[in-house]
Amino acid sequence: MSNQLPVINLMGPTASGKTALACELYERGNFELISVDSALVYKDMDIGTAKPTREEQELYPHHLIDIITPLEVYSAAQFVEDACALIDEMHSRGKTPILVGGTMLYFKALLEGLSSNLPSADANVRAAIEEKAANEGWQAVYDELVAVDPAAGVKFKVSDKQRIIRALEVYRITGQPITKLQAEQPKNVPYRYTFHNYALLPDRLELHQRIEQRLSKMWDIGFLSEVESLIEKYDLDENLPSMRSVGYRQALEFLLKSDMSLKKKQEMEDKALFATRQLAKRQYTWLRSLQEIHDFKTYLTIKQAKEDLRNSYG
């Protein structure tokens, strides 16, 4: 592994303070920022994603923000391709990349590589799977997967809709189970980089308080109006990856129903809060699984992280 191409990975659950920390590092050294967030890639989705404002992006430019519309799909494979191109370009200019975000699948793909010969997503195959789910229910789709790929059935739950879709998509295209292909196929790992991995893992109670504060601010500054504007501008539906983002899923469901009473609005806000907490829980799980394989330095507080990283990088 070459020591000539260092890459700083700054990870953490939602609302942990990682973006603010990355911006502070940016000010102190010869760095550039790359967003590792599957929601920030979407244009016009600003409030619900806690996207850095235009003013903040002018001060701290982020790559891989606002690159597609909410109608488009962005995969982990595309992220790795884009991120590696940016990393190489930054190093050619003498910059050190800081990758910051909470989409752990993207970090995992960058650190461990992706199976190189799996088929690309097929919109028609996916539409057929989603149509079956709409007509027969997700249990029927899950049962189909278990029948052709029992190992995937052990790994996935019925609620893992995107993973089920991908596994069935691969089987319908190739005729082979995705678990078999993943075990057999080589992975493309960017060995030319030296990754320096850092993770913010604050106390759960503190994180839950930060999440509540973020969502409260989100409602106050017009998140529902933002989703209404999205509905007017785009032909949205709940199956789009963009609309499966926490907050947007609950808001879209609320706005598309006839009953928009205060009671239903409160229920929607409660669902969004619960979904965000569940997201943070999954991010913790992902981080801990990555830590079992890769070298990490973890911090329990933002203050601790700032002091240590200042000493290391500025």
Swiss-Prot record:
One of its GO terms (molecular function) is ATP binding. GO terms for biological process: tRNA modification. InterPro entries: Dimethylallyltransferase, IPT, P-loop_NTPase. Its EC number is 2.5.1.75. The keyword Magnesium applies. ATP binds at residues 12-19. Its cofactor is Mg(2+). It catalyses: adenosine(37) in tRNA + dimethylallyl diphosphate = N(6)-dimethylallyladenosine(37) in tRNA + diphosphate. Pfam families: IPPT (PF01715). The keyword Isomerase does not apply. Residues 37-40, 162-166 are annotated as: Interaction with substrate tRNA. Belongs to the IPP transferase family. Catalyzes the transfer of a dimethylallyl group onto the adenine at position 37 in tRNAs that read codons beginning with uridine, leading to the formation of N6-(dimethylallyl)adenosine (i(6)A). Monomer. NCBIfam families: miaA. This is tRNA dimethylallyltransferase. The gene is miaA.
